[in-house]
Regions:
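Short, hydrophobic/amphipathic alpha-helical patches that form generic packing surfaces
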Residues: 33-37, 150-159, 281, 285
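C-terminal catalytic region of ATP-dependent kinase domains
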Residues: 39-41, 173-288
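Detector for Asparagine
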Residues: 8, 55, 83, 91-94, ...
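Conserved ATP-binding subdomain of kinase catalytic cores across diverse folds
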Residues: 1-115
């Protein structure tokens, strides 16, 4: 269970937009394709990404209206409130380490000695409890269930192996003065990005128990079993229209490993889209 992202992508703000440069290679295109999938549904709670050839993703900044509080921070706040002796113990034993290093040690202790000892179903409940507590009930258990369902379903379909405690959580809406579940973001390590040929082989052979995934269980199968499947109403015609508008050179897709894998996953989960259109046939008919 990782505590930080796989890649350390160079990032910068450019006006009201946030730009990320590929670190492993392929992250930007994956972010873009997953974003177009979401935009082809009625789901609204996500950060949209655009692709700048060859290796940059561009998204509107959710700041200053929203501030993101990762699950990592919520867990530490909960531990400090209900088990402050653990903080005291770690601080005494690691006086020469930085405060951030000590926070990581506390978190790691919680992961190893508590979180991993829970059933996967109980891990989900524990994180929901923490979110409801942290937000004073402004985010409900039903809100948490819908949110967890949305990102686990998305990650399962498109094989995002990097959903960690720093990229899911809650947001504070300064306009409304209240908390909400976070917008979905950070799907760059989907569609095989950062993985080796063994990973792709396991995907092709449907070996779901061998595909490593986070954050509740450690595999694709264990994660998807503990939450409800989110009913994304995918519209393949809308997807293609968006792709035509946003990507002038479709040759980029043909040169990428991600597009072939995305078509495969769409065919598995959406052999027919929400309107009854055969997804793979339609993509093929327009040259994709």
């Amino acid at each position: 269970m990782s505590l930080s992202p796989k890649g350390n992508q160079p990032k910068r703000y450019e006006g009201d937009y946030f730009l990320k440069v590929d670190y492993r290679g392929g992250e930007a295109l994956s972010e873009f394709l997953i974003s177009l999938f979401l935009e082809s549904t009625s789901f609204k709670d996500f950060v949209p990404y655009r692709y700048i050839f060859p290796n940059i993703s561009k998204s509107p900044s959710y700041k200053p209206r929203y501030s993101f509080i990762p699950m990592f921070h919520i867990v530490l706040e909960y531990i400090y409130q209900f088990n402050s002796t653990l903080f005291d113990k770690v601080n005494r034993q690691n006086v020469r380490k930085s405060s951030e290093d000590r926070r990581m040690l506390v978190f790691r202790y919680w992961i190893d000695k508590y979180y991993f000892r829970l059933s996967i179903k109980d891990r989900v409940k524990e994180l929901q409890n923490m979110i409801v507590w942290f937000t004073n009930g402004q985010v409900s258990y039903d809100d948490c269930a819908t949110y967890f369902s949305a990102f686990v379903t998305l990650d399962t379909m498109f094989l995002n192996t990097d959903r960690h405690f720093q990229n899911f959580g809650v947001m504070f809406d300064s306009t409304l003065g209240s908390y909400r579940t976070s917008l979905l973001f950070d799907q760059g390590f989907s569609l095989g990005v950062g993985e080796n040929s063994l990973f792709i082989k396991r995907v092709q052979l449907h070996r779901d128990k061998q595909i490593k995934m986070q954050p509740f269980g450690t595999t694709l199968k264990s994660n998807s079993k503990v939450v409800e499947w989110y009913p994304y109403d995918f519209d393949v015609v809308k997807f293609v229209n968006l792709l035509q508008f946003e990507l002038s050179n479709w040759g980029v897709l043909g040169m990428s490993a991600q597009w072939g894998l995305m078509k495969r996953q769409l065919n598995i989960y959406y052999p027919q889209d929400t309107n009854g259109v055969n997804t793979l046939e339609y993509l093929t008919s327009v040259g994709l």
